[in-house]
């Protein structure tokens, strides 16, 4: 299966957490900001990306590849000028408002006031 077909398959089979997050990010619903879902970037496919702000949002769950893979992936994405926010699916499902606040804060380059912070934030120095 080529990357384009694989990406289409991911869009059609999103996790519950990805679907919930997409409901809030799609169609400029977050403060007029444009996100894309299941977007190929180089050798990777990211869950959500805001190209203008160079921000990637990842939903991590049971199928998650692990910390070593994330470190390699995030290092490559960072080298391309992106910031990466990672949230556990459980947080997206149970603490949706806090997750959305953390994303909003990252879009506006502010620290979140929420007690929830992303599991990992990678910023380019």
What is each residue range found by the language model?
Residues 1-33, 107-125:
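Solvent-exposed, charged helical/coil patches
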């Amino acid at each position: 299966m080529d990357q384009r077909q694989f990406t289409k398959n991911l869009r059609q089979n999103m996790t519950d957490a990805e679907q919930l997050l997409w409901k809030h990010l799609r169609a400029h619903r977050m403060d007029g900001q444009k996100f894309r879902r299941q977007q190929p970037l180089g050798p990777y496919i990211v869950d959500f990306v805001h190209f203008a702000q160079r921000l990637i949002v990842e939903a991590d769950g049971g199928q998650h590849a692990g910390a070593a893979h994330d470190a390699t992936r995030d290092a490559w994405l960072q080298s391309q000028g992106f910031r990466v926010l990672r949230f556990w699916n459980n947080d997206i499902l149970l603490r949706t408002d806090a997750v959305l606040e953390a994303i909003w804060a990252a879009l506006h380059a502010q620290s979140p006031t929420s007690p929830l912070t992303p599991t990992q934030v990678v910023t380019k120095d």
